[in-house]
Amino acid sequence: MLDRLQAVEDRYEKLNELLSDPAVINDSNKLREYSKEQSDIQETVEVYREYKDVREQLQDAKAMLEDKLDAEMREMVKEEVSDLEVQEKELSDRLKILLVPKDPNDDKNVIVEIRGAAGGDEAALFAGDLYRMYSRYAEMQGWKTDIIEASYTELGGYKEIIFMINGKGAYAKLKFENGAHRVQRVPETESGGRIHTSTATVAVLPEAEEVEIDIHEKDIRVDTFASSGPGGQSVNTTMSAVRLTHLPTGVVVSCQDEKSQIKNKEKAMKVLRARIYDKFRQEAQAEYDQNRKQAVGTGDRSERIRTYNFPQNRVTDHRIGLTIQKLDQILQGKLDDFINALVMEDQAKKMEAAE
């Protein structure tokens, strides 16, 4: 591990030199690339330097115990050794986590797609519950939520809702939400009091930047139509809604949330770019690791990852076997217990694979 850490520190110093080079300063692409690389390893280098400093202090303290010391001084040095050993262990554990390969998408904004699946109107209502849950979680993180496209039902649910969450690290925390979410509750329309089971699917896509994926205008078909609101009524007599079709991949995106056709096209383009990027990313991952299934789930849209049981006020995440009896609070956006546990599980698996 120490050899790897020293190599990281050496690279950090080299990047300092490169970022001072006039040729790099005048090349915006290189400047962005090297700045990001340095930013990505800065915390590792800082913790490694602190770790080296603590190790040196520990060695000096242990060397003092070899000298002739009076009882009081020896006790003080022993206490210092004990404290430094604790610090060394804590820093070593942090470094192991920092050396785990990072997902290059972790810092990105996300596009979230929620669709009512099995269960009809009840599934659509649950899709609305999930949208509000993620919106409140985003608000707690200081992130911004922006609806891109929504298809309403007469009861106030969503057949489909697509929205963007803007915030640093959004993908790192929300990527584990990919999959099928199951709800068990008595619908308001159920007179017999029977519990129904419905599902909604969640897809979390990292926002793709223009430099990451090249989409040509000639490959996109643009269709316009009048937008509609809940219940299907027309809310705009102008042709402001936009549908984009990427001809090479067949990916289709529509947006009608804005009154302006230009703004709808801009929003739709963001979703189109993210979906195409996600398609290529998943294909590359499948080729790289076709048979391996991560403990946190494959991200398959049909995979049941979590159950929300209303009568018992509990939520169970089936991937990590975690059950929490606070469904009401979780639907208010208090997702940290699940998200932190999933992040830790993911890190543990990656550390195990790296050893």
UniProtKB/Swiss-Prot annotation:
PTM comment text: Methylated by PrmC. Methylation increases the termination efficiency of RF1.
InterPro entries: PCRF, Pep_chain_release_fac_I, Pep_chain_release_fac_I_sf, Prokaryotic/Mito_RF, RF-1
Gene3D superfamilies: 3.30.160.20, 3.30.70.1660, 6.10.140.1950
Subcellular localization, as worded in the UniProt entry: Cytoplasm
Top-level lineage group: Bacteria
Positions carrying N5-methylglutamine: 233
Keywords: Cytoplasm, Methylation, Protein biosynthesis
PROSITE patterns on file: RF_PROK_I (PS00745)
Cellular-component GO terms for this entry: cytoplasm
Xref: Pfam families: PCRF, RF-1
GO molecular function: translation release factor activity, codon specific
Main location: cytoplasm
Alphabetical list of HAMAP family matching this protein: Rel_fac_1
Family to which the UniProt record says this protein belongs: Belongs to the prokaryotic/mitochondrial release factor family.
Function: Peptide chain release factor 1 directs the termination of translation in response to the peptide chain termination codons UAG and UAA.
Name of the protein this chain belongs to: Peptide chain release factor 1
Protein source organism: Bacillus cytotoxicus (strain DSM 22905 / CIP 110041 / 391-98 / NVH 391-98)
